Amino acid sequence: MIDKTAFIHPSAIIEEGAVIGAGAHIGPFCYVGSQVEIGEGTVLKSHIVVNGLTKIGRDNQIYQFASIGEVNQDLKYAGEPTRVEIGDRNRIRESVTIHRGTAQGTGLTKVGNDNLLMVNVHVAHDCVVGNSCILANNATLAGHVEIDDHAIIGGMTAIHQFCIIGTHVMVGGCSGVAQDVPPFVIAQGNHATPFGVNAVGLKRRGFDKDEMQAIRNAYKILYRSEKTLDEAKTEIEALAKEQPVVQQFLDFFGRSTRGIIR
């Protein structure tokens, strides 16, 4: 179903069964598959392929040569009906690829709201990108990677399968991330190691002085005290009773399966 207020360029191909919302704009030489849903006000500039069981929300801007919802690159994939979901108000720049999930994973590759995916970013099968994230040019997420809200991934950075990047993290450019990066941390290098707290990012997002000091204290316990991880967790638990913002470290440790960068 194509809403009567949507614009479809004459050269675009919209397969029967696709849903195009009100005010959407499908530019020249785009292809939209039969199981695709595109929300209100979303713009496909030109030469874009959206395929498979893919749902795209409202007011997204998608630039030329992006490919969304295509078959993933997992060699075990056998055509299962896996999905891609993209939220609202994202900017997806030229030649970005976002692949559908796998039956062995969650079956879903998901991008949240208000993200910027710059040129040539790759989001592999079963990845989850949160809200208000920035993935710079040529950043590459392997399968099952999770990027939490407000994270920034530098250009030319590669992230290993199943890694988790915590909220408000900044990963420097040309890095290789092979383990999980706790919230609020700056990481860089190959393999990526911690380089302190993302103080500039936290200030921009309204963290107050007490919260920032608590985060710095937790960072020092984790990385500067020469404690084991279990010892650091115990000390951070005590700190979290006084400063709830530190609880985010503990919640992150509970999700980590690859170990954290040290």
Swiss-Prot record:
Q: What is one cellular component GO term in this UniProt entry?
A: cytoplasm
Reaction(s) this enzyme catalyzes, per UniProt: a (3R)-hydroxyacyl-[ACP] + UDP-N-acetyl-alpha-D-glucosamine = a UDP-3-O-[(3R)-3-hydroxyacyl]-N-acetyl-alpha-D-glucosamine + holo-[ACP]
Domain of life where this protein originates:
Bacteria
Q: Does the keyword Cytoplasm apply?
A: yes
Protein transport among the record's keywords? no
Q: Which GO terms describe its molecular function?
A: acyl-[acyl-carrier-protein]-UDP-N-acetylglucosamine O-acyltransferase activity
Q: Which Pfam families would you find in this protein's record?
A: Acetyltransf_11, Hexapep
Keyword line: Acyltransferase, Cytoplasm, Lipid A biosynthesis, Lipid biosynthesis, Lipid metabolism, Repeat, Transferase
Q: What is its EC number?
A: 2.3.1.129
Where is this chain's protein located in or outside the cell? Cytoplasm
Quick one: which pathway?
Answer: Glycolipid biosynthesis; lipid IV(A) biosynthesis; lipid IV(A) from (3R)-3-hydroxytetradecanoyl-[acyl-carrier-protein] and UDP-N-acetyl-alpha-D-glucosamine: step 1/6
Which GO biological-process labels does this protein carry? lipid A biosynthetic process
The record's listing under PANTHER family reads: ACYL-[ACYL-CARRIER-PROTEIN]--UDP-N-ACETYLGLUCOSAMINE O-ACYLTRANSFERASE, ACYL-[ACYL-CARRIER-PROTEIN]--UDP-N-ACETYLGLUCOSAMINE O-ACYLTRANSFERASE, MITOCHONDRIAL-RELATED
Q: What does this protein do?
A: Involved in the biosynthesis of lipid A, a phosphorylated glycolipid that anchors the lipopolysaccharide to the outer membrane of the cell.
Question: What HAMAP family does the record point to?
Answer: LpxA
Concerning its family, UniProt says:
Belongs to the transferase hexapeptide repeat family. LpxA subfamily.
Q: How does it assemble?
A: Homotrimer.
**Protein name, UniProt field:** Acyl-[acyl-carrier-protein]--UDP-N-acetylglucosamine O-acyltransferase
